[in-house]
Amino acid sequence: MDVMKLDHDSVLKELERITSKAAEVQDNILRGILERNKDTEYLSKYMNGSKDVLEFKRAVPIIIYKDIYPYIQRIANGEDSSLITGHSITEILCSSGTSAGEPKLMPTIPEDLDRRTFLYNLIIPIVNKYITGLDKGKAMYLNFVKAETSTPCGLPIRAVLTSYYKSKHFQCRPYDPFNDLTSPIQTILCEDSNQSMYCQLLAGLIHRHKVMRLGAVFASAFLRAISYLEKKWSQLCEDIRTGSLNPMITDPGCQMAMSCLLMSPNPELASEIEEICGRSSWKGILCQLWPKAKFIEAVVTGSMAQYIPALEFFSQGKIPLVCPMYASSETYFGVNVEPLSKPSDVVFTLLPNMCYFEFIPLGKNGTLSFDLDDDEQVPCDKVVDLVNVKLGRYYELVVTTFAGLYRYRIGDVLQVAGFYNGAPQFRFICRRNVVLSIDLDKTNEEDLHRSITLAKKKLGSNAFLAEYTSYADTSSVPGHYVLFWEIQGHLEPKLMEECCVAVEEELDYIYRQCRTKERSIGALEIRVVKPGTFEKLMDLIISQGGSFNQYKTPRCVKSNSATFKLLNGHVMASFFSPRDPTWVP
């Protein structure tokens, strides 16, 4: 199947086919992986050349990154791809990092691009079923690449999105009026994120009356663009007014591309934009700058959910948020077939043709319980197949890919929310390996996010929580949780103390027991950092090799890290919980 030639009807028919025959498709995927990869060093160690599915499930262990990393490292150093796959590994993908901030190197093969492209090609046809007229204008969808490095043997190391944007699948894709980007391809491929952002925003403003949808991969990237626009709108307007590009743009590709858009001065358009951007409040600014925009496309689940209030502020709640897909550097997973669902209700239909899926049950009787350590060996008979998951239950995702990951624990916790034909739909809950822990307590990303979401309401109307991360401070006895908050607006000490209390009240039973009865955890602390600190944090992480396009704020940091030092160096106020949280034996 040539995924680049599938029209909207064909790709939707294929979605129906693979989800209606999910069990059959999954069986074929696993058999195909074993047929091609049975002679690899990794599989031979467990299966002795067998391609039997039952033998695979009996003998091949369920692993985490540290188990497969030595093989990836050997390939990076020049050994043959046959260590783990029967295909040629052509790139190493550098993950954006989990919410814990740990990047990983993942093998990829050429046909992986076909699978990613198939998923991308589903998004607009699905959305078009609910939102019409997208072919009547353009999409201001902000894409970015980052400079690549290489392994000792010369394999490129790229972010997964950089890999896609540099591929023929993106650059040579057929024209689609439903997916006509405002950004010239040269601006997307510019490795200087500052110049790329400037030019892409300039292009979006030039086409402001044609833009039908807005977006970026992650909500954080889109909000970064708004922040950038707040600083640069005057210069952007000057470019439009004079018909000439700001001299700060030195990238030849950007210069050439933008010269085609800045053909002549347009003082009328510049004045329109100046009037809007010069207003005292930017509430609803997206509706005013791009009046025809019908939705904002971005990932707003998991750690991105905290950006929903900011997006709703800038859109005045008038532009729907569409969270289209669920993917990672390891493999792509699924799509949202109900794009207009509320962000809190988003579920993803896992696509059976992406890889072979398995699931580790978590907890009992449908409850969420992290009763399995990240590095604990999982019995082979504990996992269940894609089509055998149970409604309402929680699972950890496990994948087997053509590129050489076998029964690999992704680390994501999902809840079964329903079924689309024969394929289960999942709600993303959290990254299971992100925890704060002082004593017996274990606070995961979801618990932390929920607690902060409720607590920040105490700030009132004069302050706004812009960003946060956390840290388990064990330098004192007892240790305590520290939250770094960046707040826009007026700080009131009493309200900040109330926020500390509110966070603790929402943390789990064990935390409150340790805090109140056992006294093994000290009072929670909120350290308020200076405005712009989290932008500096992102700049730091990107300078260390992170991807701008895929950046996620780390939800916890370590005391000996550069990120912690940066955050702690920008603290301007500190507040502690003034009382113990409620705990009933």
Curated annotation (Swiss-Prot):
It is an enzyme of class 6 (ligase). Keywords: Ligase. GO terms for cellular component: chloroplast envelope. Coiled coil: none annotated. It comes from the Eukaryota. Its EC number is 6.3.2.-. Induction: Not induced by auxin. Pfam families: GH3, GH3_C, GH3_M. GO terms for molecular function: ligase activity. Catalyzes the synthesis of indole-3-acetic acid (IAA)-amino acid conjugates, providing a mechanism for the plant to cope with the presence of excess auxin. PANTHER family: GH3 DOMAIN-CONTAINING PROTEIN (PTHR31901), INDOLE-3-ACETIC ACID-AMIDO SYNTHETASE GH3.9-RELATED (PTHR31901:SF18). Belongs to the IAA-amido conjugating enzyme family. This is Putative indole-3-acetic acid-amido synthetase GH3.9.
